[in-house]
Amino acid sequence: SRLGRKSVMTSPMTVPAAIPPALARRRDYAGPALFAYGFRPFFLVAALWSAVGILLWVRQYFGEISLPLGMNALDWHIHEMLYGYVAATIAGFLLTAIPNWTGRLPVNGWRLAGLVLLWLAGRAAILLSANIGGFAAALVDVSFLLALASVAVREIVAGKNWRNLRVMVVLVVLILGNI
């Protein structure tokens, strides 16, 4: 070529390696874009919950509304910022980072939507904890963190990315603190 580079011609008959059908289905995700990658729904719900949670807390704290909380308003606010907002943010980060660390496909579609629903169920359970009882609320709330931890461990181990198993320490601390 004129620029001193060699021209490389590829054969038009090159065929990509066969992709197992299960991976091809997951790679060609055609569902809602919101559930294509973990950061999308979890960063969204974290942002929304941080605003809604603060508004509810301020109104509850000043007696403008009465939420059926099984704890005082300040404890509820602290709990929701840690186990609602922070947990959703960590979930969004991990579900986006782990595929990059492991080379595996991201958790998406109905499995990701299921995790989001577990997170939402935890928020509702804590919000209604005076009605459903503290034990039931705690059980529902911690189920999200347990599910997230199991997904994270499964993906990290399947990808043989042992050095990133240390992120599990953060999830274990959150789980233990939430029990």
Which residue ranges define each predicted feature?
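Hydrophobic alpha-helical transmembrane segments of multi-pass integral membrane proteins
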Residues: R2-I179
